[in-house]
Structures are given as structure tokens and as C-alpha cells.
Curated annotation (Swiss-Prot):
It comes from Paenarthrobacter aurescens (strain TC1). It is an enzyme of class 5 (isomerase). The keyword Transcription does not apply. This is Chaperonin GroEL 1. GO terms for molecular function: ATP binding; ATP-dependent protein folding chaperone; isomerase activity; unfolded protein binding. The lineage of its organism: Bacteria, Bacillati, Actinomycetota, Actinomycetes, Micrococcales. It comes from the Bacteria.
Length: 541
């Protein structure tokens, strides 16, 4: 395909236009008084959301340079969402502010590489201050406050706090749709490990890109499976039982994988294959954990079991299995309670006897998966559109609360960035264009608070000036319009969210500033007419 190339200021401004279009659509959602955005879907009802990354994903632009600019900012939102589970809108607003200030300085003749270095040093200094000012979460109420802000609903916040209290920070919290109106919390025994489906052909829910198996058999094999003959016996027995099958093995490839996929596509037999978690001895131990939890056995030649001879009695079972591209969750494994308790006691003893911090950490993870269980939050709503939006908010709030437990909290509402910045810049000594780069960060960190104030109908400049004069931790509670001690009022953000937002925004801003050329696909002017050729050469007949 032919390419078009833009250079210098034209290239950077094209990227900036794309960034601005996307950021302007996303930033209306920031803060307690932020608005929603309606997203049209090709199929089904439209989605209403205030989640930055969901909005960003839906935006596709015509202009090739603008499209690339928008894609770069999508990456900021996505990366922040992946790491912290929230803060996507803050990251987008910060990226827009950093790029705007940065490009102004590049146009005025500043050296882009020096600006980038200055931005990186300033961001590092601000993050150090953020981490130093972080307060560890100690109570259930603090978790509830953090989750409530993310979800915009105190009821959701307190439910998430209760769920985290029950399963611990290593436990798993999932969100399911409910037929009843309102919210309920259900605790189920379960386990999650970080391996997803081997092939996307196994997906049963295309929108969420996950495979859901109800009441499946679970085949656990400590070796590779490539020959379909090994699987035939067990597949026939499972198919006769009319149940789906989860296969956990070192790897599944070749004709064995192809057979499973073909049967899934034809609708003959529902299954999903995932790789076993871990490596070496740790893999063996984790497979044994899964076997005990599900009431199955690990099929391994070491213990004299061969796959081709396996019957249903060697397979585990569970109420439900959910597999995404990255992880597998087994809910309500049918294992014997005494055996599970024995395994938990054995792992606890290993933790006590272990000298290695790394081994202890890995054993602790295994213990949490066996003993922690899974908390299921069931959400209901009046309409499908509202249900989708509510479910999404709860999922974000869960990740937000976990981030808060992990690294602590800081004052919310964009205040922590400004106050950490004030301390960081007082001690930062840079020269020349690096100092200019640091100044870009100094200006940009005001942007989230300004946007929160703007969305609340207040004058952004006045609010920022007022906050600068307040004691540390005090700021604007945009929900009430009152200036107060934000942590005491329960207005807080996980430091992990704020830190990730600033880091990712600065990373992309540095790329924008140092870009000198953009190569894009040339837009096609005349798309071919639908339905075949234009009868060229037929003299109009």
C-alpha cells in the first residue's frame, strides 16, 4: 500500500490534533461531576460509560496522522488501565497537557531530546514525593471510600471493601450479571492462575473475549499433548456426558489442538485448552493444587498414569470456569474439603521452613489461591445498557481498591499531584532545556484538577491557586464544592493509579516531542463498488 509522509511541525501537529480529539471526548468524564459518553455499537444497545479507556477504544479517525496521534494516546489509557485498573482519564488529560506545552516549546526552538530528559527527571521527582506522601490503607472504611470514588457509588464501595476483607488482597473478586435488581455479594471457593486460552477460537463470549464453561470436567496433564490419539478416549467419554472440558497441560499443539478447535467451531463439543502455570517443580506443585481443588488427579507418567488410558474418574470438576486471554478462574472446585485443608496446612509449613524470600512469596501466592477463594459481586439493573455500565464501573472499582491496598492512598481530586509537584520542584535543579522540560511537567500536573473543577462548573484557575495555598492533603471536594482535608473526607486516590497515569502520560509525551516524521497509509479515494466489477470494457452493456 502507498504511504504518505509528513515532516517536522506538520507531523507533530497532525499527531496533536488526533490526541486532542480523543482527549476532549474522554476528559468530560473526569471527577465526581464528570458526565457520561454514549458509544454506538455495531450490534445491540449503545453503551453509556464514564471509563476513559472504553471511550478511547471506540474512537477511530479518518485523517491518517490524526489516527496515529489518537492511537498513541489510546496506548496511554490502556497501559494505565492494565497496570492500575483506573486513572485512564487522568492519564489522557496529563498526556494532552504535556504534549501541548511541549510542542509549544519545540516550536519556539527548544531541543526535543533535552525537553524529554527534563520531563523524565521531573516526573521521577514528583513520583518520589507521591510515594513518600502515600498513606497505607488500614481500615475497611478507607477501602470503601477509595472504591466508592472510582465507582461513583458508596454502596458499591462498601460491598467491594467487604469482598476484599473476606478474600484478602491476594484473593479474587469477579463481577457477574444478576437477574435481580441491586447488588449482592457471594463468596465461593475458587482459584485463578495467570494462563489464558491457547487459541482465540475457544472464545464463547465474543464481546468480553472470554470462554465460560458451566459445570465442566477438568483434565490436568503434566506433559505436552500433540497427538490426537492420546486424547480420543477421554474426549469420547466427556462427550457422552454432555459436559464441556477444560484441559490444562504443559502445551497443546498440532492435530490435538486442531481437533478441539474444529469441534468447538462446529458446535459439536465445547472445550478450552490452557497452558499449565509456572515452570519445573513449581508447575508440578501448582497442577497438584488444581487437582486437589477440583477433585481430579494430575495425569503424569511419573505416577504411572497415561493420558490414552484416562477415564472420567481422573478428571476434576467445578461449578464454572472462566478463561480470558491472560488468566483462568476455576469457581467452586469439587475437591474434598479435608484434602484441601491438608494441602493448605502443608503449604503453610513450607512457608515457615523456607529461607528464600522468593520461594516464600510464591508459596504465599499458592496459599491465597487455595484458601482465599473467589468473591462474586452480582450486579443487576433496570435495563441492559445500565447493567453493562454498572458492571464496568464495579470492575474498575475492584482494581482501584486492590491498587490502594498495594501501594497506599494519597489525597484525591488531582490535589496530590500539585502538592507533590510543589515539593519536588523546590529541590529540582536543572539547566537549559532540561529545566524547560521540568517546567512543562510543572504546568501539566495542574491539568487534572483544572478539568475536575471545570466539569464541576467552577473556575479552574481560581481553584488551582486556592489549592496551592492549602495545607498538604487539603483540597477541593468537587462533589460538595467544599475545600477540606480530603483524606479525612474519604476523597482519595490509590497512589499506584496517580503514579501510573503520570508515568505513562510522560512516556508518550516524550515520543510526541521527539517525532520528526510520520509515515502513514495513504487513504484510498475510490473504494470499489460493492458486489463485484464495474463491467469495464463492455462498452456500457
Amino acid at each position: 500500500m502507498a504511504k504518505i509522509i509528513a515532516f517536522d511541525e506538520e507531523a507533530r501537529r497532525g499527531l496533536e490534533r488526533g490526541l486532542n480529539i480523543l482527549a476532549d471526548a474522554v476528559k468530560v468524564t473526569l471527577g465526581p461531576r464528570g458526565r457520561n459518553v454514549v458509544l454506538e455499537k455495531k450490534w445491540g444497545a449503545p453503551t453509556i460509560t464514564n471509563d476513559g479507556v472504553s471511550i478511547a477504544k471506540e474512537i477511530e479517525l479518518d485523517d491518517p496522522y490524526e489516527k496515529i496521534g489518537a492511537e498513541l494516546v489510546k496506548e496511554v489509557a490502556k497501559k494505565t488501565d492494565d497496570v492500575a485498573g483506573d486513572g485512564t482519564t487522568t492519564a489522557t488529560v496529563l498526556a494532552q497537557a504535556l504534549v501541548k506545552e511541549g510542542l509549544r516549546n519545540v516550536a519556539a526552538g527548544a531541543d526535543p531530546l533535552s525537553l524529554k530528559r527534563g520531563i523524565e527527571k521531573a516526573v521521577e521527582a514528583v513520583i518520589s514525593e507521591l510515594l513518600a506522601s502515600a498513606k497505607e490503607i488500614e481500615t475497611k472504611e478507607e477501602i470503601a471510600a477509595t472504591a466508592s470514588i472510582s465507582a461513583g457509588d458508596p454502596e458499591i464501595g462498601s460491598l467491594i471493601a467487604e469482598a476484599l476483607d473476606k478474600v484478602g488482597k491476594e484473593g479474587v473478586i469477579t463481577v457477574e450479571e444478576s437477574n435481580t435488581f441491586g447488588l449482592e455479594l457471594e463468596l465461593t471457593e475458587g482459584m485463578r492462575f495467570d494462563k489464558g486460552y491457547i487459541s482465540a477460537y475457544f472464545v464463547t463470549d465474543a464481546e468480553r473475549q472470554e470462554t465460560v464453561l458451566e459445570d465442566p470436567y477438568i483434565l490436568i496433564v503434566n506433559s505436552k499433548i500433540s497427538n490426537v490419539k492420546e486424547l480420543v478416549t477421554v474426549l469420547e467419554k466427556v462427550m457422552q456426558s454432555n459436559k464441556p472440558l477444560l484441559i490444562i497441560a504443559e502445551d497443546i499443539e498440532g492435530e490435538a489442538l486442531a481437533t478441539l478447535i474444529v469441534n468447538k467451531i462446529r458446535g459439536t463439543f465445547k472445550s478450552v485448552a490452557v497452558k499449565a502455570p509456572g515452570f519445573g517443580d513449581r508447575r508440578k506443585a501448582q497442577l497438584a493444587d488444581i487437582a486437589i481443588l477440583t477433585g481430579g488427579q494430575v495425569i503424569s507418567e511419573e505416577v504411572g498414569l497415561k493420558l490414552e488410558n484416562a477415564g472420567l474418574e481422573l478428571l476434576g470438576t467445578a461449578r464454572k470456569v472462566v478463561v480470558t486471554k491472560d488468566e483462568t478462574t476455576i469457581v467452586e472446585g469439587a475437591g474434598d474439603a479435608e484434602q484441601i485443608a491438608g494441602r493448605v496446612a502443608q503449604i503453610r509449613a513450607e512457608i515457615e521452613n523456607s529461607d528464600s524470600d522468593y520461594d516464600r512469596e510464591k508459596l504465599q501466592e499458592r496459599l491465597a489461591k487455595l484458601a482465599g477463594g473467589v468473591a462474586v459481586i452480582k450486579a443487576g439493573a433496570a435495563t441492559e445498557v445500565e447493567l453493562k455500565e454498572r458492571k464496568h464501573r464495579i470492575e474498575d472499582a475492584v482494581r482501584n481498591a486492590k491498587a490502594a491496598v498495594e501501594e497506599g492512598i494519597v489525597a484525591g481530586g488531582g490535589v496530590a499531584l500539585i502538592q507533590a509537584g510543589a515539593k519536588a520542584f523546590a529541590n529540582l535543579t536543572l539547566q537549559g532545556d532540561e529545566a524547560t522540560g521540568a517546567n512543562i511537567v510543572k504546568v501539566a500536573i495542574d491539568a487534572p484538577l483544572k478539568q475536575i473543577a471545570f466539569n464541576a462548573g467552577l473556575e479552574p484557575g481560581v481553584v488551582v491557586d486556592k489549592v496551592r495555598g492549602l495545607p498538604s492533603g487539603h483540597g477541593l471536594n468537587a462533589a460538595t464544592g467544599v475545600y477540606e482535608d480530603l483524606l479525612a473526607a474519604g476523597v482519595n486516590d490509590p497512589v499506584k493509579v496517580t503514579r501510573s497515569a503520570l508515568q505513562n502520560a510522560a512516556s508518550i509525551a516524550g515520543l510526541f516531542l521527539t517525532t520528526e516524521a510520520v509515515v502513514a497509509d495513504k487513504p484510498e479515494k475510490n473504494a470499489p463498488a460493492p458486489g463485484g466489477d464495474d463491467m469495464g470494457g463492455m462498452g456500457g452493456f
